[in-house]
A protein has these predicted regions:
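Short acidic/glycine-rich loops and adjacent helix/strand connectors
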Residues: 1-119
Length: 119
């Protein structure tokens, strides 16, 4: 089974695609950068909203896969910045509904390979 995962906990919006055997098909990221200081949550959210579609498209393209090839969607629940996490949740939910596949939450100590092996 092939899993598409979304990471959006803070300054980076990322999309990774893996299978249950441990093969990585793609890992595409786009990072929010500030000129001064740390992360501004509302600005990071805007960045993620602007980057999300291209990041997912690029990951699928790099993996030479179509969205319909995906059997499971996952996303990071946290810890992280709530505005950023919500962008990832919404994108993951949108994709899951579009192709009618399960949506799972990833927590920091989950082993995704074990999870998709049992789906």
């Amino acid at each position: 089974m092939i899993c598409l995962g979304i990471e959006s906990t803070a300054h980076t919006f990322g999309c990774g695609i893996i299978d249950s055997k441990g093969k990585t098909y793609a890992n595409v990221t786009d990072a929010y950068k500030t000129e001064h200081g740390g992360i501004h949550p509302s600005e990071a959210k805007k960045h993620h909203e602007n980057a999300k579609d291209k990041v997912v498209e690029d990951a699928l393209k790099n993996a030479n896969l179509k969205l319909e090839d995906i059997g499971l969607i996952s996303f990071s629940q946290g810890p992280g910045l709530a505005p950023c996490l919500l962008v990832g949740l919404k994108k993951a939910t949108e994709l899951s509904k579009k192709i009618n596949v399960p949506l799972i939450i990833l927590l920091p100590d989950y082993n995704i390979y074990e999870l998709i092996e049992h789906c």
